[in-house]
Amino acid sequence: MLWLLFFLVTAIHAELCQPGAENAFKVRLSIRTALGDKAYAWDTNEEYLFKAMVAFSMRKVPNREATEISHVLLCNVTQRVSFWFVVTDPSKNHTLPAVEVQSAIRMNKNRINNAFFLNDQTLEFLKIPSTLAPPMDPSVPIWIIIFGVIFCIIIVAIALLILSGIWQRRRKNKEPSEVDDAEDKCENMITIENGIPSDPLDMKGGHINDAFMTEDERLTPL
Amino acid sequence: MAHAPEPDPAACDLGDERPKWDNKAQYLLSCTGFAVGLGNIWRFPYLCQTYGGGAFLIPYVIALVFEGIPIFHVELAIGQRLRKGSVGVWTAISPYLSGVGLGCVTLSFLISLYYNTIVAWVLWYLLNSFQHPLPWSSCPPDLNRTGFVEECQGSSAVSYFWYRQTLNITADINDSGSIQWWLLICLAASWAVVYMCVIRGIETTGKVIYFTALFPYLVLTIFLIRGLTLPGATKGLIYLFTPNMHILQNPRVWLDAATQIFFSLSLAFGGHIAFASYNSPRNDCQKDAVVIALVNRMTSLYASIAVFSVLGFKATNDYEHCLDRNILSLINDFDFPEQSISRDDYPAVLMHLNATWPKRVAQLPLKACLLEDFLDKSASGPGLAFVVFTETDLHMPGAPVWAMLFFGMLFTLGLSTMFGTVEAVITPLLDVGVLPRWVPKEALTGLVCLVCFLSATCFTLQSGNYWLEIFDNFAASPNLLMLAFLEVVGVVYVYGMKRFCDDIAWMTGRRPSPYWRLTWRVVSPLLLTIFVAYIILLFWKPLRYKAWNPKYELFPSRQEKLYPGWARAACVLLSLLPVLWVPVAALAQLLTRRRRTWRDRDARPDTDMRPDTDTRPDTDMRPDTDMR
């Protein structure tokens, strides 16, 4: 009798948990990819932990606080490591709706990942999209800060250059004497404008007959 | 000609003094920096790759020797001799040719508009490189946070960052969209940097050029060393440099080589004329021309090696990822243990599985992974820098550092070219005396930079990239070729070959050899005529552009669309505008002469003046004919 009951139970379980069954989810783990040398082997103890995590997630759902580890059924464990699981109700006759299981897993995905040292890419619940981490948005984007710094430096540099240019010009205007010495060398200077010497004498201001002045300067080197 | 052979007219620099380079190195670096630009990094390697690898160097060298160096020499020589910017130089050669100078100024203005926009994009990427992880490394999640944004999912994180988060591009050129504020402030910053460096002309440029011209070489060396140590680099180099001689039979190769050498040396901008005009007249411009052209050439090669080794790494990386994805599909579907199929075993395993479970394998999304396919994927222009390189950069350890170095290099390269381009606009304006004498030079440069910045804001619109491509294709290419052609013809045939050789003999101490004379007289104009014809032929095809349209069925491929009527009109206008100055100026000059002749004739009715006498250009604008 007991044997019959046992077979019946396993048969029912087998029906409930099957690849592609209603409310069943496929899980895929990539332990070696995630951990490399430190990868652990997937054995029944790990399966037990998995069942415990799923049960834990379900218990957080209102109305499902009575979920036990035995309500979570695993099947078709492959070498990949992948398997299917379903969560049954306390009567163990029906499986809980996929929507509930999905939302429960989604809310606790982080805890489940951490229990196995995996992340969203290496512990995949096919058909349950994981909630992506919110993008790290600092209140002020970094590029604006750097831009602000650089722009301020540029503005200061421009201001300094303009100011130094103004000072230089003021200094030059106050020293016309230096200009006179150079005029002697300038006799041969010919510009494009029809051979009239260029006019450094403008610096002296006033109305001066330039041609006359040039002659004068040449003859009186003092 | 302004300065007849007389003792040292340059010694007299007074109130009107023309600024001078502090030393020869500044001048050489400025010309080199102007010549070496973004094109050396992202255009030459692409051409090399497309046109048969090492074999492309043959037409390239031939074009350099017969076209690039001779025209370059002409520009440096006339700038140095006549000591004026492009407008002054051409007015001095012949008043009827003053349009060439005006055309150069207009062209440089148009080019500076879009070139600095590219520099602004580079600046934006540079600013965004100061974070880890880099913003283009992953797609942003969508609203429910269940997956990634659809556009990003369909293309790639780097493409999404470029087209959406940087440009925010519209799907059509008709749809202008709004101004993107982040691009606008980057553009403002770029123009501020340019202003800061050209504020007092070569006085300030000469100081900055030490950094902006040399820093790219430093970074290229670092990238070269790094690139050669990356896995797959040698495969990239071998594949990309292996010469494919058959491709030389395609005439396109020769034409593209010639146009590339042309733009690469930044000829016909007027920038080299401007720079050379600040030289002392007795400078060996012939040696300078050869040296700078060769340095530019070597830089292109050097950059290609660095670029190809990085591309080889990328191709190998992509190939391995492709294999890995296929292997994962197999493992997941058949539930094999993890990492049970290595990359080498994959073909055998696939064959075996295909034999035993053909239907199941056929359903899997397996892609054919061939290394050559990945190596063949070439990109040029902004696509290389902002999409291909950023993606490669993500795979290199220490990604933000490499990104900073790369974009820093592009920024300084673009900047040094901008100096030449802006100087090509400012020097003629200064010479012509657009603003009164009491206005300081800083104000003029500021005004020019402000006008350029305001005009360039159209490129910060959402459709800005499409407009930039229009400017690049239609404003630059045809005009540069036609203006260069007019330059050579103007100097050789209007100014006179003999007089030009005499001037060069006076400046450099030796007469130009027959090579120079032959290339100036015959080869360069001939080549240029061919290119102009080629460019015109290009226009006969319907004008198309490639749009980024997320709703396109074949997304992420770009959708080919025709330019609307008004855009086509803009294309034509841009390609004609600078060159139109030539006939307009010549006509204006003719009319002025005629009017003067009539006026003189009316004032002195007894003198028997033949109208021709006055229309001869020599009497007015060449005072040295009186001096000789």
Curated annotation (Swiss-Prot), chain A:
Principal localization?
Answer: membrane
Question: Which residue ranges does the entry give as Extracellular-facing topology?
Answer: 15-141
Claim: Secreted is one of the keywords in the record: no
Q: Name one GO cellular component term.
A: brush border membrane
According to UniProt, the tissues expressing it are described as: Kidney; collecting ducts. Pancreas; beta cells of islets.
Q: Which InterPro entries match?
A: Collectrin, Collectrin_dom
Residues exposed to the Cytoplasmic side:
163-222
As for PTM, the annotation reads:
Glycosylated. Glycosylation is required for plasma membrane localization and for its cleavage by BACE2.
- One Gene Ontology term of the molecular function aspect: protein homodimerization activity
What clinical condition does the entry mention?
An interstitial deletion on chromosome Xp22.2 encompassing CLTRN and a deletion spanning CLTRN exons 1 to 3 have been found in two individuals with a neuropsychiatric disorder characterized by autistic features, anxiety, depression, compulsions, motor tics, and neutral aminoaciduria. Plasma amino acids were normal in both patients.
Q: What is known of its domains?
A: The cleavage site containing the double Phe-Phe motif acts as negative regulator of shedding by BACE2.
Identify this protein by name: Collectrin
**Organism listed in the record:** Homo sapiens (Human)
What are the leading ranks of the lineage? Answer: Eukaryota, Metazoa, Chordata, Craniata, Vertebrata
Curated annotation (Swiss-Prot), chain B:
Q: Does the keyword Transmembrane apply?
A: yes
* GO BP term, example: sodium ion transmembrane transport
Q: What is its main location?
A: membrane
Q: Which UniProt keywords apply?
A: Amino-acid transport, Glycoprotein, Membrane, Neurotransmitter transport, Symport, Transmembrane, Transmembrane helix, Transport
GO CC annotations, alphabetized:
apical plasma membrane; brush border membrane; plasma membrane
Answer whether the UniProt record assigns the keyword Zinc-finger to this protein.
no
Protein family (similarity comment): Belongs to the sodium:neurotransmitter symporter (SNF) (TC 2.A.22) family. SLC6A18 subfamily.
Q: Which disease is it linked to?
A: Genetic variations in SLC6A18 might contribute to the disease phentotype in some individuals with iminoglycinuria or hyperglycinuria, that carry variants in SLC36A2, SLC6A19 or SLC6A20.
Recorded protein name is: Inactive sodium-dependent neutral amino acid transporter B(0)AT3
- Tell me what gene encodes this: SLC6A18
